[in-house]
């Protein structure tokens, strides 16, 4: 405890603030701005594929918009079916299962629960692997110029 209060809490906030300033954008957190862009892209692709309107919302396990807040927003919008896709491609008890736990903690308080689908992992999905390969190729193409 002396180490925490004596050294860590006196030095870490200043170092962390400097690191955050380096990656923060005009939109704020890069995680949030990237998540919003992914959400918009997924909404567009799903609406094309399903030929109709689809609600796609971003939720964060340890941040805002939170999982409970987002689930309530979908419920209030009249969602009858929810598909939850964690952005962790591989399953892990500390990440994917933790997000599932947060979702379950919220839903167990509801009187009526919509139809629900949970995508547990997709690291070995051919479409995901191809997308990673295309992204890697684009990145290395830009780096080698």
Descriptions of predicted regions:
Residues 1-145:
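Active-site-proximal alpha-helix that buttresses catalytic centers in soluble enzyme cores
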